[in-house]
Amino acid sequence: TRLSRGLGDVYKRQVSLRYFNVYGERQPLRGTYAPVVGLFLEQKKAGKPLTIVGDGEQRRDFTHVKDVVKANLACIDSVIGGYQTINIGTGKNYSVNEIAAMISDNIEFIPERPGECRETLASNSKASYYLDWEPTIDIKDWINEYEV
C-alpha cells in the first residue's frame, strides 16, 4: 500500500513476511479456517472421518512453523532496505486429497466454500536472496514422523 511504502521511505526498512499455510506444533485446531493439517490430525485422533471441503483438489503450499520462525529470525538479522514483501513457503504444493491420504483413508467430502482459492504456491526467490533462507521441513516427512 502507499502508506506502507511511505513509512518504508521514512524509516528506511519495512518488511512483510507472507506465510503460506503454516502447520506444526500448537497449530489451531478449531474454526472454519483452521489449518487443514491440524483439523485432519484432530479428526483422526477422535476416530472421525477427515472432512474435505469441495473436491479436495485445491493445492496448498504447506510451511512448518519452525521454518517460519527461522525466516523471522533471518529477517531480524538482515540488512534489507526500503519496503519488501517476502513469501515464506516451501515452493511445493500438495492437494488436500494428498494430505488427507497421508493421514487416513476414512474421508468424507463436504460442500465447497464460495470464493475459496484453488491453488497457493510460494516463490521463495526473495527469501533466498534477502534472507539466505530455505525451508527445511517437508510436510510428508513431518506427517510420517507425527503419531498418526
Language-model segments: which ranges?
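Flexible, glycine-rich beta-alpha linker
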Residues: 12-35
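Single conserved hydrophobic/aromatic residue that forms the stacking wall/gate
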Residues: 1-11
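Short, well-ordered beta-to-alpha junction loops that form the rim of enzyme active sites
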Residues: 1, 18-19, 55
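C-terminal substrate-binding subdomain of Rossmann-fold SDR/epimerase-dehydratase oxidoreductases
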Residues: 5, 44-148
